[in-house]
Amino acid sequence: MVVKVKQKIPLKIKRMGINGEGIGFYQKTLVFVPGALKGENIFCQITAVKRNFAEAKLLTVNKASKNRVKPACSVYETCGGCQIMHLAYPKQLDFKDDVIRQALKKFKPTGYEQFEIRPTLGMKKPDHYRAKLQFQLRSFGGTVKAGLFSQGSHRLVPIDNCLVQDQLTQDIINKITQLVDKYKLPIYNERKIAGIRTIMVRKAQASDQVQIIVVSSKEVRLANFIGELTKAFPQVKTVALNSNRSKSSEIYGDETEILWGQEAIHEEVLDYGFALSPRAFYQLNPQQTEVLYGEVVKALDVGSKDHIIDAYCGVGSIGFAFAGKVKSVRGMDIIPEAIEDAQKNAKAMGFDNAYYEAGKAEDIIPKWYKQGYRADAIIVDPPRTGLDDKLLKTILHYQPKQMVYVSCNTSTLARDLVQLTKVYDVHYIQSVDMFPHTARTEAVVKLQKRV
C-alpha cells in the first residue's frame, strides 16, 4: 500500500460505490471518498488504510461534476443520515440502478447479465417523506437535544429541522425535547445506563394520527409530560413506554406498554385500511409504499385457486392486496404485536382466508408444509440481512411456482439470487426510491419457477 494515514493526495473519481462514496485510484490503490462524485477531480486526505483499499475525507473539489448540487441541509456533512444529497435527484435514481448492477456483478447469479433492470421509480417531491423518526436524546450542557449519531460514532448530532422527515413528526420531537427539559426527566447516560434513550414518533399518512414510543432504561413518570404534549398536538393518539436496559446498540427492549391512548393508529395503502400498533413494522415512506406495493401486485399473476405465503408480513399490508382474489394468504412475522395487528386487520376487512402466526419464516413455513399447506406463490420482504439460509433451502425444496422478492439491501439480494436462480428465472428487477438522498436502494424482483 503506497498511501499513509493523513497523507493528502489528488484523485480523479472514476465511479460511485454502493454506499454513495466516490471511488478513484491513486497509484493503483483503490480510494473511497464520501462526498465525491463521478468525474470530479478532488483533493483528499487519507483517514484509513486497509489491506486492499484506503479511505479518505474530501478536502476540496477542484473540478466539480455538473450533477453536483448544494445540499439544503445544515447538518448534512455531520449527520450521516443522508449520503447523496449533494447529487442531483435524477442522477440519484441512475445511481440506484447502478448499485443493483454492481451487486449483481459482484455475486454473479445465473443469467445476471440478461436480467431486465427497470429504471428506478422516484418521487416528484423527494423531501419530508419519512413518516417515522427514531431520535436519540442526550444532554448538552444541561440542555436536552434530540438527533442522530454521526456516521460510525456515538456522537449525537442535534437535529431540529430534518429535510427528509415529515414536518409534523419533527415539530413533535422538538416539543418533546422542551418537555423533557421542563419536567427534568432523566436522560440516558452510557456510563450509568439509565434514563430515556430514544424517542420514536410515527405518523399515519391517511389519518394524521401519531403514536410515540419513549424508550427508557429506567422507570419514568410521564403523566405531566403526556398531558402537555397531547394538548399541544391532538394528533397524538398513543404514547407507549419501551423498557430497554441492555448495553447493546439495539433500539428497543422486549417490553412495550401503552401508557396513554389507543392501541393502534389507522393507516391506508392501495385503498384498504389497517391498524398499526407502536412496535409493528411499516415502511417509512407512505407515498412510495403505494408505488412499492403496486409493483408487488403487478409482479404476481394469481387467481381464485391460488395460495400465497407472505413472509415477513408485518401488519399484513402486502398480503391484503391479494386476499380478495386468492384462495388463501398466510403470513408470519417475528414481532407478536405485528401479528396481532394483522389478525385484527384481516378480521376487520372480512378476510377469513387470511391466517397469521408469530415466529420466524424459516421455522413456520416448513411446519406449514409438513401440515400439508402448499403455496403457489411466495412474497418475501426480509430485513437488510436478507433471507435466512434455512428459509432459502425451504423455498428451493418446495419450489412455489411464483416468487416476489422485496429487497432493501442489494448486496444480500444478489447473494440470495445466486441460490434462487438455480430454480427460478428472474423476469425483471424494479427499483423504487423509498429513501431519496440516501444510498439505500429498494427493489421488487419478479421470479418464476423454471420449466
UniProtKB/Swiss-Prot annotation:
CDD domains: AdoMet_MTases. It holds the Pfam family tRNA_U5-meth_tr. S-adenosyl-L-methionine binds at Q283, Y312, D333, D381. It comes from the Bacteria. SUPFAM superfamilies: Nucleic acid-binding proteins (SSF50249), S-adenosyl-L-methionine-dependent methyltransferases (SSF53335). Keywords: 4Fe-4S, Iron, Iron-sulfur, Metal-binding, Methyltransferase, S-adenosyl-L-methionine, Transferase. The active site is at C408 (nucleophile). Belongs to the class I-like SAM-binding methyltransferase superfamily. RNA M5U methyltransferase family. NCBIfam families: rumA. This is Uncharacterized RNA methyltransferase SpyM3_1299. It comes from Streptococcus pyogenes serotype M3 (strain ATCC BAA-595 / MGAS315).
